């Protein structure tokens, strides 16, 4: 999915004003990437993954449920003898699932706090660096960012040269594969369908770049140079094999 920071708190407020009873926020990239404050957001339910920006292994996540007597009929879909003991207890044990990944969270917190400013410092630096790298790329390619820097988190959408001829979701997927196989670059590519009235030379492809503490400037130079080489070779997505 394309990346942009949306005003969740304001959207929840609008939902309340419009009479929406319950609001569920699916914030897959939230924790470790943007500020997360349940009381300020005001949603009834909020979930986020800790394996994306909080340095945890896959399957570590959390689900917040606002305390309310209205949710007494809310239950986990996979439940047995704990039925009726509350959502937290009902969700505590699901068959033979491996829960060892959750045990790393205390050590992850220790690791995060080794960095200057802890998670707040990491988020700030990630944002600053990804915007800097995004601006470097659009300057090199003569394109633009997909949204203003203030609407970026630790990720940013970077316009790709129009001459690459990205004209479908399939083209975007095949170009991503090409970058991985030929240049050792892994980056999500997204197709933006032209609006009515837009003509040739329009940016239709965007790359979603991200920045984490282990990234280096050379990673982004490698991506820049790979795209430049494709452009110099007069590459277009039409030349990619049809799979």
Where are these regions (language model features)?
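Pyridoxal 5′-phosphate
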Residues: 1-243
